[in-house]
Amino acid sequence: MNTQLNNTNKKSLLTLSALTLAMALPVTAATMLTKDNGAAVGDNQNSITAGERGSVLLEDVQLIQKLQRFARERIPERVVHARGTGAHGVFVASKELDDLTIAAPFSEAGKETEVFVRFSSVIHSKGSPESLRDPRGFATKFYTDEGNWDLVGNNLPVFFIRDAIKFPDMVHSLKPSPVDNIQDPNRFFDFFSYEPGSTHMLTWVYSDYGTPASLRKMDGWGVHAYKMINKSGDVKYVKFHWVSQQGIDNLDAKQVAKVQSQDFQHLTRDLYEEIGKGNFPKWDLYIKTLDPSQLDDFDYNPLDATKMWLDVKETKVGTMTLNRMPTNFFQSTEQVAMAPANIIPGIEPSEDRLLQGRVFSYADTQMYRLGANHQQLPINRAKVDVVNYNQDGAMNYGNTTSNVNYQPSHENVSENPIARRSQTQLKGYVQQAAIKKQQNFAQAGVLYRGFSKQERTNLINNLAGDLGKVQNSDVKHKMLSHFYKADTEYGTRLTKAVNGDLKMVKQLASKL
């Protein structure tokens, strides 16, 4: 009797299980786990073994594939600007700039252009605390009707150096030592003691501007001069400036210590949370312009990346709103490839020596990180058709069907004369020499005197914290002489803060 009941129960249970499975299949089929080739996975919890105590078998494709893919999840880290966060948005032109440029985003008032912005730290590694003192990258990709335009700048208006040939050395000095992997002020101040042009940027970085409280509450600067070209071929030099509608908010040293002890990713978290709440940050874009004939009107070189155009009026040309965060960090923020080489008709690089190097370097490093076909990735893909004969290479998923992969040919694929490079009149000789009107210290002094009393004190304390660690007396006093040359109060206070010899500082400064 018991046996009969058990068999009956078993049959009922099997019938019920089969019915349940049949009912469930249409619901779960769409979420079935698969291998990379699309084939179903039968067991993702246990490896295939030779019996209970035997070795794992090499034929376990699911195990091997998971381990292989896991070992290849990381692409090369950016040499600079490694840690970052990004957001989607829109730029709206506030006026047409036909008199200045044929660039698509400025073709008419009210014109909307989709953008992606990547904020970043410059020197520190991908997993570093966001509260560390560092310039912040502020790079914007415009998806325009004429192709992608990348405006790759920072949250500070100038840079440490003016010639790209010094860029690798500068970064090496700022990065951790190759011996012990520790970032060392002895190293980077040694380098900067030979680069008096860095005084202006160091004054910015060691002020509270070097530790922003929020990505939403900092400005962005193009840093370099660019060129704008109108339909007549007329050229104007231009500088770009993003002005935060949220205002500016920085952290002092005490606030930095408090924030870092609580949240080492406060900048990223703030951006995600605020945009998630619908508090969309906005920046107004301003430009300054100079006629080529005005370049000699200043006591400095306007194409020097260590300088600001202090006496040139700004004009508002549009507003950017960030309104959507990426749904996948890697696919968007990590794979986005910003490069000053990505320009469109109506905008060109100037003769700024640092920018000239960046035009090559940034595009090249993106090819190294992401491959030759990185511009086919969704985050980098232009909204317009890409028509050229660049072909093949790793991860190329284009579809070349024509027998003609060259130009010119009988096929009707031609150039657009409006996109030709503007003409620049040259004079002089091919040379290898520094620029003439360097003025290494004046603008650093203007900046220092423009700070409030508390901002000056914070700057001195921040600088003394690192400069006071420098063991080489010559290096320390050369640096002190640079700051003294910028402003006597600046240099005197800093010398006292690091127990320097003011008499020696004055002697060194007199020779600058």
Per-segment meaning from a language model:
Residues 1-30:
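Gram-negative bacterial Sec-dependent N-terminal signal peptides
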Residues 30-512:
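Active-site-adjacent core segments of small-molecule enzymes
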